[in-house]
Amino acid sequence: DYCMRFYERQFTTREQVNKDIIVRFERLLDDYFDSDGPLREGLPTVKYFADKVFLSANYFGDMIRKQTGQTASEYIQNKLIERAKEALLGTDKTTSEIAYGLGFQYPQHLSRMFKRVTGYTPNEFRSQN
């Protein structure tokens, strides 16, 4: 009886800790893109965020996958695409300006990733929406 209560408490506590880390990761991602991080450091990496939450990159990546069903890299990539969509629809910036603002070294990399994920080039997406 005691062992089961202890086990359940450990499991429940771990689940909550993992959810808290996901929330922190989401906040850190937003803070990164809202700051000059992309201009200073380029595209964010899994290691960068793992360091911020004091976990190894491998453990952090495994935890993100278990909680979200996506790898940490996919999660970051989806946030990049979401931010690119917002900029395409909410500003008059060129695709190049958006790419550099998100931390891409070359605008073509954003265009390629955007097309792979959405099925549209950034310009096609902008004109259709």
Regions from the PLM with identified roles:
Residues 47, 73, 96, 112, ...:
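Residues within the helices of the helix-turn-helix
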Residues 1-15:
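Compact structured core domains
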Residues 67-105, 127-129:
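Terminal helix-turn-helix DNA-binding modules in bacterial transcription factors
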